[in-house]
Design a protein with these regions (language model features):
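Acidic, glycine-rich catalytic loops of TOPRIM or P-loop NTPase phosphate-binding modules used
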Residues: 3, 10-14, 18-48
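Acidic beta-strand-to-loop metal/phosphate-binding motif
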Residues: 6-8, 46-60
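Short, ordered loop/turn segments at secondary-structure junctions
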Residues: 11, 28-30, 56-58, 80-87
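Short, well-ordered alpha-helical microsegments
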Residues: 13, 61-65
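Short hydrophobic alpha-helical runs that function as membrane-insertion/retention elements
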Residues: 23-26, 51-54, 78-79
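A short acidic, often aromatic-flanked loop/helix-cap motif at beta-alpha or helix-coil junctions
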Residues: 32-33, 85-90, 174-175
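Long, charge-dense
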Residues: 69-121
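C-terminal, charge/polar-rich interaction regions
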Residues: 113-116, 120-190
Length: 190
């Protein structure tokens, strides 16, 4: 399993999710400054798996990176840096203020290299096969999705685990897989 990767926004997350199979959390740019639940989630995930911070290489990216350094134990955080590449993202009409491409504008290999340089850990395939993951079917069987009252049960579990209340069912599944084994999940009393 990868560490949990922290990026600035949804376009960064979309780009990165095509490169790695990892839990990716977005800070919503500076939104993290006013989001106590998201900070708590980062702390929880850092303790469970460790974090890799992968923000843009502009001033704003470094402000966010330094903010995370201040609210999560630095021993649990690795920092991945993308190179300064000048240009503009395809979806934007103009380049960023500093004229640099962000995470979303990087080629897949550049992102992978940045993560490897940061010391990202990859579990080998054997470990993955031997440890079954919590599935959407498990969530359904536990009444946490696809049934009447599922939303209430999810909210109850989210509170019990001290997670952000706005977590979606898929987000909850990611967090559960990052913080516990399938066996532990099946023994949960919800």
């Amino acid at each position: 399993e990868w560490e949990v990767i922290v990026v600035e926004g949804r376009y960064d997350k979309n780009t990165l999710s095509q490169v790695v199979d990892a839990v990716i959390i977005e800070t919503s740019g500076f939104g993290i400054f006013n989001d106590a639940e998201k900070r708590k989630l980062l702390q929880t995930m850092a303790e469970a798996r460790g974090l890799i911070v992968l923000t843009d290489s502009d001033g704003a990216g470094f402000v966010i990176r330094n903010y995370i350094k201040g609210c999560v134990d630095p021993k649990l955080v690795k920092h991945a840096y993308i190179p300064d590449v000048y240009g503009k993202e395809r979806r934007k009409s103009a380049p960023s203020r500093e004229g640099k491409l962000g995470v979303e504008g990087m080629k897949p290999q550049v992102l992978l290299d940045a993560l490897i340089r940061a010391g990202a850990t990859f579990d080998d395939e054997e470990n993955k096969k031997s440890a079954p993951r919590i599935s959407k079917a498990d969530m359904y069987a536990h009444g946490l999705s696809g049934r009447e009252g599922s939303a209430e049960k999810r909210t109850q579990l989210i509170r019990q685990l001290g997670l952000p209340e706005r977590l979606t069912a898929d987000g909850l599944l990611d967090v559960l897989n990052a913080t516990m084994s399938r066996e532990e999940f099946l023994m949960l009393q919800v």
